[in-house]
Amino acid sequence: KESALVTAGWSAEARKDAFERTMKSGLPTARDEYWKYTSPKSLTSKKVEKAPLSQEKDGAMFTGANPIKIVFVDGKFAPKKSADFEVSGLSVERLSIINKLDLHWAKDVYGKYEKLSQESVTRPLASYNTAYADEGVVIHVSERIERPINIIYEHSDEYSDVILRHIIKIDDNAELTLLENGPAAARLNQVMEVKLSDGAKFNHIRVLGRDHERRTATHIFGELGGEAKFKSFTLTVNGVLTRNECFLNINGDDAAAHISGACIGDGDFHHDDTVFITHDAVGSESRQVFKKVLRNGATGVFQGKILVKPNAQKTDGYQISQSLLLDEDSQFLAKPELEIYADDVACSHGSTSGAIDE
């Protein structure tokens, strides 16, 4: 409801705009072309399906990397479980705290790339997140950070329904590695917006799943400046429904975006990777590489698009999606697309699926 929106502070204008866009579009349904292969019903229904509490020790997954730990439990920041740190060139704040301020640098990022993504296709879950998200991390990086940040998710409520929003700004020639893992909620709607300035580097690794019962929709939106490098890899193991969306704008010459993922699905597992990369600069590069192993009736989906604008000469864009089907009941659905308006490019896509040779 509109009365639940934040009506003061630096994010209020973006939230109101997102609310109005969501009301105009409505929540997604199975009739929408963009949701042709994945029913959004369990992500939009008022009822949250039960997800038994995890017994896995996900918090120890990346211990060997000596990360800076930030922990969320049921979508709320857990200070006693999180690290207390001071690192030169790194600022980490909570959205719920800075939201009360009148001015903040995050105003120039919050909702900007989410709204831009809506020009190509309507994404109501993302605009809903912009309107209502009240927690997440806001990260500003001005140097090369040696230690990775590890966001660890836990849930203590079998019916937890969580909305999270992360905002990341990386300055010229600075670098950050971000790790994500753990069961965030029975149902999760998460958005991450990333702004990479010239020469900035962002390395992102996340691990989702290991439990069948969770329902997750994640979105990554971002912009790349000149010679910026954006790398994101997601490993997904099970989950009733996982929808990972990524929309990136390459606006700087010689920048590169590599988006990849792997998943192992069993039974009623349904996993959807949907990626849209826009090239709007000279000499830019993109890679979309996704591989899935499916059995016992599991379903995998890949929707990928590369858009090359007229000025984006010498673009190098590549897509590949592959699946291994371990039985006749499993299925892989793919929709790779190229839309090219420049004449000096090297772009290709491919998709294959099959069984193990006997």
Stretch-by-stretch model annotation:
Residues I98, D108-E358:
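Conserved beta-strand/loop scaffold segments within soluble protein domains that form the structured core
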Residues K1-T130, V289-R295:
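N-terminal amphipathic, basic helical "cap/leader" segment at the start of enzyme domains
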